[in-house]
């Protein structure tokens, strides 16, 4: 069975859309405001005061969208994607016309075609979001055609239970909900100097005291640090036994990742949220530069 059509469709979620402003987002399904807006969160732009207050002040507010792939018999697959209009244009104007007519079951071939189509301008960044949206929708379609859940098509369940953790600063709520692990967003980065560093340390110390020794703690740094700051903070936080420290460095700086790995070999490092495609993961795994993807 062949692919009949591929199209991007806008989906409307609370607080999204072309006119939605970050400071106006309403999280109607949450008990409390999102941690992204509840206070300072260190990020690559916090060195600039006008964007230091909170992360959504500079990140895109493009509307969410989805991708629908329809087969010749009318069966359809669906997936969601981020970064709205720019990615939707890549889907509709570039990738979709070149995939129509391919087999609905040829997931590997279609993926390879999309990666290769990125050669003129790079297969990472926004192009990778378009690839992912079509790839996921194609897997959804494949599962419907074969009448099997996608996890079975990928080899079946690998485990009976999944390790789950919370993210944010509302620790008392997370403990009330029964989480045994929680990840804190790091509020301050190098631009905040010694005072910010000390506040980061105090946050972890206070949280460890609150949750006790049997709850895992992690720290999300969202690409905000340089190597020196990352090493210094990791050394200060060593007594609090963090399960991992996440995304301390800019994603593309592999030399910095290598330096960090050498200087704090005792600390579990996690990253990969902002790596796109397979190449960065292959590179990092072959060194190895980090412990967790």
Residue locations for each model-derived region?
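Glycine-rich, aromatic-flanked loop segments that form ligand/cofactor-binding clefts
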Residues: 126-129, 135-169
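Structured beta-strand/loop patches that form or line metal/cofactor-binding pockets in enzymes
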Residues: 1-72, 79-82
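Conserved, mostly hydrophobic/aromatic
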Residues: 3, 74, 95, 134, ...
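Metal-dependent enolase-superfamily TIM-barrel catalytic cores that perform enediolate-based chemistry
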Residues: 155-264
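Active-site phosphate/pyrophosphate- and oxyanion-stabilizing loops and adjacent acidic/basic residues
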Residues: 140, 152, 205, 258, ...
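Catalytic alpha/beta core domains of metabolic enzymes, predominantly
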Residues: 252-293
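Metal- or metallocofactor-binding catalytic centers and their adjacent structured scaffolds
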Residues: 22, 45, 54-55, 70-145
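Short catalytic-loop micro-motif centered on adjacent basic/acidic residues
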Residues: 78, 217-220, 243-247, 269-271, ...
